[in-house]
Every structure is written in C-alpha cells, then in structure tokens.
C-alpha cells in the first residue's frame, strides 16, 4: 500500500505533468515496468493464498464464501447480519452530483453494489464496518464434526444485499464487488535539478511528521 500511495502515485503525477507541458518523459516506460512487476507480485500472492487455503483445510479449518453456505449456515448468516452488521452500515447511492472520493477513507475496504434493472444500472457503495466487527467471522460448529468454518465479513454483506436494498429500489439483479481505497500520499515533492535526493527525501519525511 505504501508503494502505491507514494512511488506509484508520484510516477502517475509525473506523466500528467509531462502531458500538460507537452514534453517527453521516461515515466510512462517506468509505469509500465511497475505495473508488470505488480502483476507478478499478485500472481505470487495468489499462489501463496491457495497454498494457505490448502494447509488450513488439512488442519480442518475452512474459509468459505457466500456461495458455499449450507441452509443452516445461511440462516445463521442472515440473523448475524440483521443483528450485528446492519446497524453499522449505511449504503451511499452513487450519483453524478456526489463526489464519492470525499466519502472514501484511506485503507478502508468497501463493497460496490451494481443494481441492475433491465439494461440500466445504478450503483451504491458500502463501507465494510471493520471498526466495529471482525473481518473474519467464525460460523457455528456442527455437532459431531471437528472442523472450523470461517467466512469474511465482506461475503456476509454480499449474501445479504437483498436485506439492504429490497423495498427501497427496484432491480432484477444485484452484485457486490470488494474494493479497497488507497489514497495518493500527495507529498508535493519538487524535482528541480538543484534538489539532491537526500533533500527530496528529507522534505517528504517532514511532510509525513
């Protein structure tokens, strides 16, 4: 996250400044290399995540999503949502006259909701209330089975989207997608020739204190 907040954001700013001034810049090439590296890191993360899930399963710990719940778990999740989750969430309807960025908090996770009616879509934003609730929720154990089942709070909300929107909006289908907000650190570092690297770093650190 720190990399995207500072270095990645800085390179993108350089590109925008270069475009405004009509000059050439190596930043586009650098950005491409950074994106390629980020994709490789994501692939490594996916591999490690898959291995972690397999190791958890060997220890009889299972991470499930909303599509893997049985009927008993569905009923429990719905009750948990109504009692514990719903009081802490307020969907934000996304409209053209609303500056969504002013509502997004840095380092917070959200679910974007697509409410579809015919060929039209309306969008809403839900902050995942991790300030009030655990991100990982343990489902009740089944009698006679020595296994632990865990579900993400995100998936509980996705499963219960109808609980939030039914009766307030007309829709044929709705889908939720997880996202996380990582803001540009906006260090305002100056890159004049006379500034040494040490001076630039010192200025950046001072802005963070």
Regions found by a protein language model. Name each.
Residues 1-209:
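N-terminal non-catalytic structural scaffold regions of very large proteins
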């Amino acid at each position: 996250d720190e990399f995207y907040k500072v270095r990645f954001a800085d390179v993108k700013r350089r590109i925008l400044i270069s475009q405004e001034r009509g000059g050439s810049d190596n930043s586009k090439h650098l950005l491409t290399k950074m994106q390629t590296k980020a994709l490789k890191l994501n692939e490594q993360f996916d591999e490690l995540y898959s291995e972690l899930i397999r190791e958890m399963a060997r220890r009889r710990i299972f991470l499930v999503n909303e599509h893997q719940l049985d009927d008993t778990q569905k009923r429990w999740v719905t009750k948990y949502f109504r009692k514990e989750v719903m009081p802490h969430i307020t969907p934000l309807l996304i409209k053209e006259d609303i500056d969504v960025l002013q509502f997004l908090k840095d380092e917070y996770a959200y679910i974007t909701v697509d409410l579809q009616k015919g060929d039209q879509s309306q969008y809403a934003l839900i902050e995942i209330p991790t300030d009030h609730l655990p991100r990982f929720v343990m489902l009740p154990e089944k009698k006679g089975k020595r296994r632990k089942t865990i579900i993400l709070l995100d998936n509980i909300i996705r499963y219960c989207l109808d609980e939030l929107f039914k009766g307030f909006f007309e829709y044929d289908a709705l889908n939720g997608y997880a996202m996380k907000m990582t803001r540009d650190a906006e260090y305002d570092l100056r890159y004049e020739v006379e500034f040494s690297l040490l001076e630039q770093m010192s200025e950046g650190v001072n802005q963070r204190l």
